Amino acid sequence: MAKPAARPRKKIKKTVVDGIAHIHASFNNTIVTITDRQGNALSWATSGGSGFRGSRKSTPFAAQIAAERAGQAALEYGLKNLDVNVKGPGPGRESAVRALNSCGYKIASITDVTPIPHNGCRPPKKRRV
């Protein structure tokens, strides 16, 4: 006998007050992920996913747009306070933090979590233009 069709349950949005914004700024792209305190992703955005391709992905303006998109999406969860972790040497570091600040978040701390090798892998060769 056929089972009756299960009614789709409404997805319950959890409310999160404190979160962490992880900004990964590489030379080619900027990735902004906003998580709760446990590390569960609430929203994310990238420069490439925001409509920038090629060398325009690595600009501070592209990082600003990506941070604004991730910040606006995370506002639906009731997020108010952010700790910011910045990783990488890219050009979008400061502009992404400024964009999150302009979204209305109260930024409690900014931490640089760029991994520094203890003489690990050989770095890429210098460019000759």
Swiss-Prot record:
Keyword Ribonucleoprotein assigned: yes
GO molecular function annotation: rRNA binding; structural constituent of ribosome
UniProt keyword S-adenosyl-L-methionine present: no
One GO CC annotation: ribonucleoprotein complex
Source superkingdom: Bacteria
A UniProt-annotated Pfam family: Ribosomal_S11
Biological process, per Gene Ontology: translation
Gene3D superfamilies: Ribosomal protein S11
Record keywords: Ribonucleoprotein, Ribosomal protein, RNA-binding, rRNA-binding
PROSITE patterns found in the cross-reference section: RIBOSOMAL_S11 (PS00054)
Entry-linked SUPFAM superfamilies: Translational machinery components (SSF53137)
Chain segments annotated as transmembrane: none
Described function: Located on the platform of the 30S subunit, it bridges several disparate RNA helices of the 16S rRNA. Forms part of the Shine-Dalgarno cleft in the 70S ribosome.
Family: Belongs to the universal ribosomal protein uS11 family.
Cited HAMAP family: Ribosomal_uS11 (MF_01310)
Subunit structure: Part of the 30S ribosomal subunit. Interacts with proteins S7 and S18. Binds to IF-3.
Protein name: Small ribosomal subunit protein uS11
Gene assigned in the entry: rpsK
